[in-house]
């Protein structure tokens, strides 16, 4: 019995040992699993938080980029819509184009009293008001030669009017668009011309400065004609020259053509920074650059100018002018391209109307920097005028 039971006992012991070892490994595995879960609980949220923050930051950045892009797209569509709408607006309302041509509503310099030219350093200048037509009043400045500045102090309008009959020649100055007769570069030119012994008479067209009326090419030309006749009625046999600048060259050639047709031409015509006609000038103007290649540019932008009665056809007018002609133009003119002034000269020079008169073109090199309105700064200007117009003899008393 003892021998038979020993193997059984040994077998039971081995099974118990095996059972205990298997239960131990299971317990160990269970314990490892618990530790792993505990570690995950401890480390999981801390590791997940940076990932969540990064995701949120990326979403915000993408949202901002999307918002910026949407705003840029809206701005782009608005600009594009405005770009397309402007030509149609101008076509439907030709008066807009007329205002852009005249720019009479741009009054610079601001806050000056045109009744007091002495405030602009013109202490030998008188302010007048003339009435070319009913309901139209224009402001006029008359600057006497600089050699008379002492005698001119405190004198009234009658003294200035009588002074036109002196032996000094007279320049009727027709200014361009925008501003007034008190514009800085205009005042500086009056001073130069006055120092050379000329009377200078200038005015603001109807609708400019303190002048009353509605601007138009016809009205501007009629205002100039009225002032010219007013001068001639007081100047006797003194030479009267007409000087036009920029848009004023269009008024000047309109005026001189009319004077030649009635056989009372001026003694000379001076055109500073002239163009050929208003259509070519508008097409060449810097403001037209963004629309120059727009489909139907002429129909949208140029035809409304013509339909408003604005032509300023210098190229046609010079064919009917019979008096000496001097053209001054700076090569670096950014407003009226130099080639338009040269083209006008090439039209005028061979014209039959000038066969008995001198036609001269004087360019000013771009290095001088005179651009559109600073030719008055040229030290050569007195010599140019003296050679073309003749010497103005100064008088020291009146």
Swiss-Prot record:
Outcome of substituting residue 253 to R: In PHARC; abolished monoacyglycerol lipase activity
Free-text description of this protein's post-translational modifications in UniProt: Glycosylated; glycosylation is required for optimal activity.
Active site per the UniProt annotation: 246, 333, 372
Bilayer disposition of the protein: Single-pass membrane protein
Activity regulation annotation text: Selectively inhibited by DO264 (N-3-pyridyl-N'-(1-[3-chloro-4-{2-chloro-4-(trifluoromethoxy)phenoxy}pyridine-2-yl]piperidin-4-yl)thiourea). Reversibly inhibited by triterpenoids, but with rather low potency.
Broad EC category: hydrolase
Domain of life: Eukaryota
Activity at various pH: Optimum pH is 7.2-9 with 2-arachidonoyglycerol as substrate.
This protein's UniProt keywords: Cataract, Deafness, Disease variant, Endoplasmic reticulum, Glycoprotein, Hydrolase, Lipid metabolism, Membrane, Neuropathy, Retinitis pigmentosa, Transmembrane, Transmembrane helix
Enzyme Commission code: 3.1.-.-, 3.1.1.23
Disease: Polyneuropathy, hearing loss, ataxia, retinitis pigmentosa, and cataract: A slowly progressive neurologic disorder with a variable phenotype resembling Refsum disease. Clinical features include sensorineural hearing loss, visual problems related to cataracts, retinitis pigmentosa, pes cavus, ataxic and/or spastic gait disturbances with a progressive sensorimotor peripheral neuropathy. Other features include hyporeflexia, hyperreflexia, extensor plantar responses.
Name of this chain's protein: Lysophosphatidylserine lipase ABHD12
Source organism of this protein record: Homo sapiens (Human)
Lineage: Eukaryota, Metazoa, Chordata, Craniata, Vertebrata
